């Protein structure tokens, strides 16, 4: 009976350890994916700001053309 308890305890302990390792790896993978998503969103934000800057520059240039006339 004591042997069965020890064996069961060992199996449960090893199962718990393997689950915690899998959870840790899963969290690391999710963190990497989130970091990649953050980098992509930063790139999009930078692109949007450049586009807006270009649009504003074009509007400003057009308004200066009309002022000179």
Swiss-Prot record:
Residues 1-22 form the signal peptide. The mutant DRS S9r3 shows antiviral activity against HIV. The keyword Transferase does not apply. One of its GO terms (biological process) is innate immune response. Keywords: Amphibian defense peptide, Amyloid, Antibiotic, Antimicrobial, Chemotaxis, Cleavage on pair of basic residues, Immunity, Innate immunity, Membrane, Secreted, Signal, Target cell membrane, Target membrane. Atypical cationic antimicrobial peptide with potent activity against Gram-negative and Gram-positive bacteria. Acts by inducing permeabilization of bacterial membrane. In vitro, also shows chemoattractant activity, which is mediated through a G protein-coupled receptor (probably FPR2 coupled to the ERK1/2 MAPK kinase pathway). Has slow-kinetic self-association and amyloid-like properties that modulate its activity. The lineage of its organism: Eukaryota, Metazoa, Chordata, Craniata, Vertebrata. This is Atypical cationic antimicrobial peptide. Monomer and/or weakly self-associated, oligomer, and amyloid-like fibril. Can adopt a monomeric nonamphipathic alpha-helical conformation, possibly with the aid of its cationic N- and C-termini, when bound to anionic membranes. Forms stable and ordered beta-sheet aggregates in aqueous environment or when bound to anionic or zwitterionic phospholipid vesicles. Residues 30-40 have a biased composition (Acidic residues). It comes from Phyllomedusa sauvagei. The keyword Ubl conjugation does not apply. Residues 25-45 are annotated as: Disordered. It holds the Pfam family FSAP_sig_propep. InterPro entries: Frog_antimicrobial_propeptide. Residues 23-45 form a propeptide. Has a highly hydrophobic core sequence flanked at either side by cationic termini. Expressed by the skin glands. Its main location: secreted. It is found in: Secreted; Target cell membrane. Transmembrane segments: none annotated. Thermostable.
């Amino acid at each position: 009976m004591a042997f069965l308890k020890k064996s069961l305890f060992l199996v449960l302990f090893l199962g718990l350890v393997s689950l915690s390792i899998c959870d840790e790896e899963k969290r690391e993978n999710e963190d990497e994916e989130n970091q990649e998503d953050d980098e992509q969103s930063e790139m999009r934000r930078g692109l949007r700001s450049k586009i807006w800057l270009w649009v504003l520059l074009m509007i400003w240039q057009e308004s200066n053309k009309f002022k000179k006339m």
